[in-house]
Amino acid sequence: MVQFASRMDLLKGSEIRELLKLTAQPDIISFAGGMPAPELFPVEQMMEASRAVLEENGRVALQYSSTEGYPKLRQQIADRMLAKNNIHTDADHILVTSGSQQGLDFSARVFLDPGDVVLLESPSYLGAVNAFKACQPRFIEVPTDDGGMIMEELEKILATTERVKMIYVIPDFQNPTGRPWDLDRRHRFMEIINRYEIPVVEDNPYGELRFEGEYLPALKSLDTKGLVIYLGTFSKILAPGYRLGWVCAEEHILAKYNFMEQAASLQASTVGQMETSKWIEMFDLDAHVATIRACYDKRRKVMLETLERELPQGCTCTHPVGGLFAWVVLPEYMDAKELQMKCLEKKVAFVPGGSFFPNGGHENTLRLNYSCMPEEKIVQGITALCRTIRENLR
């Protein structure tokens, strides 16, 4: 009889990925995925960049390359982190990964032994929870509100908990709630972290997708002790199919991530890195991101206006000012998984929120994505969702 490692008992397929199989049908109005709008992918420009790479350096592009990543792309990433996040870094502090999801997996493998404690926001990104589970940690959820992680609660936990090895956070337009941390909490968080000297994994896939207000500093830009490991990605600002992300950290920490990448995949795709670098050289990434923001902002406004009009009393919704998601809290007696099945019968999909709480509970919550559906479908789908909620109120 085949015997698997005990860690496999802790792992299960992502509910979101499983749901996406159901929602692939063209007649489904899906608010389930966190996917960018495919009509915004710069396909023709990417074809030009790809052709240029293969004509100029085809044999290099199709060969193995260094684990650290394509040097020119790493420098372009460092330059953009300075321009957009005020993070002073260089190519030597950048490791290119196969998406930031791989950076999450490496973070767990670098820092966590079985029984170690991970602190994270409540709720938090399901993909990170699943990546961390393979290393068999204990999760402690830190309460949040509209300003982000509540610092008083974080201090209480740190003062009374042993074996805290890592803190995982998404300060900008958090997945699943869409909420950003306010400026004061970012500064207070770093003061606390510096006192306890615990490594922080800052996941920032949505930082450039702000629709309202001023950009706030990344935690990494406030880091004076080298405790923040910053994860970035091209998935939300260019194209997820290339599977290109990066880790930015102090060299002694980055060396451990480098070992993990050597063991896991040797390197990220050479041709993908070179084509992305060439695209950045040939075209205007800032203009492309501005186009993405304008599209998502329009869809966000339509979703929020429809929710404000249709969502029954007793339900609440966040007001995201960036990112891809809105978060709905239903009456406590309502089960979002049961609601999901009823909505799927009406060809509408969303993600039940309980999956985003690693310790369970909160089954009366749900996550909505607004980036992938055209405005008329958003109105139709949200109206149907809210009608179904009303039909199930007590």
Model-assigned labels for residue ranges:
Residues 7-99, 106, 281-282, 349, ...:
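N-terminal small-domain helix-loop-helix segment of the aminotransferase-like
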Residues 60-197, 201, 207-225, 296, ...:
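Conserved core of the PLP fold type I
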Residues 72, 256-259, 290-302, 380, ...:
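A non-catalytic, amphipathic alpha-helix used as a structural packing/dimerization or gating element
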Residues 224-294:
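Conserved core segment of the aminotransferase class I/II
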Residues 277, 294-304, 316-329:
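Conserved glycine-rich beta-strand-loop-beta hairpin in the small C-terminal domain of fold type I
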Residues 314-346:
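Conserved PLP-binding catalytic core of the aspartate aminotransferase-like
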Residues 345, 359-394:
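PLP-dependent enzyme catalytic core of the Aspartate aminotransferase-like
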